[in-house]
Amino acid sequence: MSDASRISPLDQARILSEALPHMQQYDEETIVIKYGGHAMGAEDVARQFARDIVLLEQTAINPVVVHGGGPQIATMLQRLGIKSEFAAGLRITDAATIEIVEMVLAGSINKQLVGYINEAGGKAVGLCGKDGNMVTASKATRTIADPDSNIEKVVDLGFVGEPEKVDLTLLNQLIGHELIPVLAPLATSKGGQTFNVNADTFAGAVAGALKAKRLLLLTDVPGVLDKSKKLIPDLSIGDARKLIADGTISGGMIPKVETCIYALEQGVGGVVIIDGKTPHAVLLELFTDQGTGTLIHK
């Protein structure tokens, strides 16, 4: 039995009526959606996400999808006998690894997602940050504390980059023309070196350059949690910084929230961290009164 068949016709009509003002709010606005590798899950989940993206485009919203692929990269590296190493939450990417990363991100994952969107009736265009020099990056570095001496040291992450500049020339040719950009988080240096970029960071940079109405970060957690592990539905930038300082926001959530803050400071209207495994998470956030996840705003 389908989800729709379990809802009465009257309730279906009420749901559509509730969605109308939200559709009007986002009319012809750009929404950047980061679709994480963990959130992709099974094929049926990915296809459902693709249908929801097509629905956004059909309601006069301009969706831009940025996808991750950490689990898929890890699987491919394991198959090839290449060991994965991480520092400060980022994959250390040597010369052998960057070739695999590019193959998985810009090849299999990107084209699969493009195919799902097109099968659902959309017109997706698969790209990465290297295309049209869309995203220029510089080498990223991180400092970590030695567990024995507690002395901080700089870690060489290899071919991992931080976005420096986003050129919107190519994206502006697609957005608003019934085309859905699907972006793999790869960038190039001024000298032509390929860099692997964290998908959250990449999405934040693109959303900031576009001055997007919303940036949605689909992850594998419900949102930002308090110390009792309860969802915090709403945070200002100031609140978020306080929660980082007191340790409530910790671990892998820190860079996600920092990306949210950066995007807001660049002109994004609001950023929401949501659980990508929740069915129709994007529609629940954009088209219902209660929304979902954690909204971070100025």
Swiss-Prot record:
Residues reported in the UniProt entry to bind substrate: G69, G70, R91, N196
Site (Transition state stabilizer): K34, K256
Keywords: Amino-acid biosynthesis, Arginine biosynthesis, ATP-binding, Cytoplasm, Kinase, Nucleotide-binding, Transferase
Gene Ontology terms for molecular function: acetylglutamate kinase activity; ATP binding
Pathway field: Amino-acid biosynthesis; L-arginine biosynthesis; N(2)-acetyl-L-ornithine from L-glutamate: step 2/4
Gene Ontology CC entries for this record: cytoplasm
Annotated compartments: Cytoplasm
PANTHER family: N-ACETYLGLUTAMATE SYNTHASE, N-ACETYLGLUTAMATE SYNTHASE, MITOCHONDRIAL
Function: Catalyzes the ATP-dependent phosphorylation of N-acetyl-L-glutamate.
Family under the similarity heading: Belongs to the acetylglutamate kinase family. ArgB subfamily.
Protein's recorded name: Acetylglutamate kinase
Native source organism of the sequence: Nitrobacter hamburgensis (strain DSM 10229 / NCIMB 13809 / X14)
